[in-house]
Amino acid sequence: MNKTITALAIMMASFAANASVLPETPVPFKSGTGAIDNDTVYIGLGSAGTAWYKLDTQAKDKKWTALAAFPGGPRDQATSAFIDGNLYVFGGIGKNSKGLTQVFNDVHKYNPKTNSWVKLMSHAPMGMAGHVTFVHNGKAYVTGGVNQNIFNGYFEDLNEAGKDSATIDKINAHYFDKKAEDYFFNKFLLSFDPSTQQWSYAGESPWYGTAGAAVVNKGDKTWLINGEAKPGLRTDAVFELDFTGNNLKWNKLAPVSSPDGVAGGFAGISNDSLIFAGGAGFKGSRENYQNGKNYAHEGLKKSYSTDIHLWHNGKWDKSGELSQGRAYGVSLPWNNSLLIIGGETAGGKAVTDSVLISVKDNKVTVQN
């Protein structure tokens, strides 16, 4: 990786145009989900609660319009995708009817023509939180994410502990003090066929599952970038799924954001350049883990990356910077660029702005 960037390159990469990319979101927006269909952007959930909004990016007077509220309750870390004109929302973390925080494995469908939601009679074979979703040949594919039983059990224990700080400390120590493989993050690839509403096994990673990875796909290839290897410990790994031909192939590319990696980063493609930007992590956690400290991020402060990396000639190059570190927003393809909507910055503060990252001749332009 080229660790040296000239002042001119940074200046070009950090250029902010006078006009805003998109109007500010109606509420500070993080940990939600979003999708784009026919140049109309849809965002919702996360810090927006059950609210959903749309914005026509081609309209002369661009503005966010409120849609019908999501019927499944407030959720973080859900994913969404458009297939054949309908918006599908997968899983997420929220509260059940008893008020307990849990991982969901359900699917909701939104019809833009009628502005209405319906909960499908379809459940994924495992929970969906921290997972990624992408579309290929008319099907939605899901991989990664936390283990539903382990995650739900953790929050059940916290609920029973109430406000007993000593018990809460013990629960946290017990939860975080395990090796990565003991969290059983999902390494299976599942496919969802909207025509039948059936889930199918589509393969599995030869390595390990992650949570909070960035995902982007083009044609027959999909890339999963970084994410958590276990709670509090990120990975710098990059996985490529290649659907070319009849057999799905998994490839491991050169790492990025080394050595600690990030979660909640942003990925996209501009003029055939693969982009990875932002994300959050704990510097020093990888070294702690390698030295035998399973609770690797204990006592460490979460940091937010400003780095913009490009995949070029078989390696990652740091090619620019965001104006501020951010993570856990929405990544969407728009105008042959990577569109970032919302996210959080230092201290977990949710933001309302958008960022557009474009690449031409391996030079990055950032528009705020």
UniProtKB/Swiss-Prot annotation:
Signal sequence annotation: 1-19
Top EC group: isomerase
Name assigned to this protein: N-acetylneuraminate epimerase
Primary localisation category: periplasm
Lineage: Bacteria, Pseudomonadati, Pseudomonadota, Gammaproteobacteria, Enterobacterales
Role this protein plays: Converts alpha-N-acetylneuranimic acid (Neu5Ac) to the beta-anomer, accelerating the equilibrium between the alpha- and beta-anomers. Probably facilitates sialidase-negative bacteria to compete successfully for limited amounts of extracellular Neu5Ac, which is likely taken up in the beta-anomer. In addition, the rapid removal of sialic acid from solution might be advantageous to the bacterium to damp down host responses.
Subunit structure: Homodimer.
Reaction(s) catalysed by this chain's protein: N-acetyl-alpha-neuraminate = N-acetyl-beta-neuraminate
Organism: Escherichia coli O9:H4 (strain HS)
Record-linked HAMAP family: NanM
Location of this chain's protein in the cell: Periplasm
Keywords: Carbohydrate metabolism, Isomerase, Kelch repeat, Periplasm, Repeat, Signal
Recorded GO MF terms: racemase and epimerase activity, acting on carbohydrates and derivatives
